[in-house]
Design a protein with these regions (language model features):
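A small/polar active-site loop signature that marks catalytic segments
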Residues: 1-144
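C-terminal soluble interaction/assembly domains
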Residues: 94, 104-233
Length: 233
């Protein structure tokens, strides 16, 4: 409906100069097939149609490839769905509120944007870990749907080229985590099943790093690999 409203507004503006009048507002049709059936007319032929990917599919893509534009869009959709404005402020407020509803101590979370690019964002490793815990074992089973989007070490998404050396190969195929990459900040938050079959959640964050320094990402990957190999039973 938002797209239809925008189209109608632009049509009114363009038509004014040509002496055309376009009625204000947009009405939702019951559907061409239903309308045709009610009037006894032949059903129209569909010339073309486009269907959006589902929200779940978009969330999977966002997590897999770390799509910042999609993250911002999801944030605004969440804002509208919770009665807030579809603005940046509405989106960040919605994310913080939903994190709190999931059991995360969200009172100290500071968000300047949703995708995580802004340097003013402040989220602790504990808050990321609690978010993953809510997704994996929390009472709201709806959150489980996003777990498939977590990249898998050495196999998919932003982790597809990692976990290939001797120090991290033990985590390949086992570590599932969302990456975070800025010039001086790196993060890896996710979950892994260890050698004893226990589900472990984790979040590693490196701040004040030398941009592009060798070993930064490998350090996070080695830490997650150690968790994958844990076992004392």
């Amino acid at each position: 409906m938002a797209a239809a409203g925008e189209f109608a507004a632009r049509l009114r503006a363009a038509g004014a100069g040509a002496g055309l009048t376009v009625a204000a507002g947009v009405e939702r049709s019951p559907g061409a097939a239903a309308a045709a059936g009610a009037t006894g007319q032949a059903q129209p032929v569909v010339l073309a149609e486009v269907e959006s990917a589902t929200v779940a599919e978009q969330v999977d893509l966002m997590l897999q490839v770390s799509d910042n534009y999609l993250a911002e869009t999801m944030g605004r959709m969440a804002a509208l769905a919770t009665g807030r404005s579809g603005s940046n402020d509405g989106a960040t407020a919605a994310v913080i509120a939903e994190a709190g509803a999931a059991g995360v101590a969200a009172d100290t979370i500071k968000l300047v944007d949703v995708c995580g690019l802004a340097l003013g964002n402040q989220v602790s490793a504990r808050q990321f870990t609690d978010t993953v815990r809510a997704m994996t074992t929390g009472p709201d089973s709806r959150l489980r749907g996003a777990l498939d989007g977590f990249p898998v070490g050495g196999l998919s998404g932003t982790l597809d080229t990692r976990y290939g050396d001797a120090a991290t190969a033990g985590g390949a195929g086992l570590v599932r985590a969302k990456t975070g990459t800025l010039n001086t900040v790196l993060a890896l938050s996710g979950y892994v099943v260890d050698a004893d079959g226990r589900l472990l959640v984790f979040s590693f964050i490196g701040n004040g790093l030398t941009p592009g320094a060798a070993g930064n990402k490998q350090a996070l990957d080695r830490a997650a690999t150690v968790l994958a190999g844990c076992g004392c039973r």
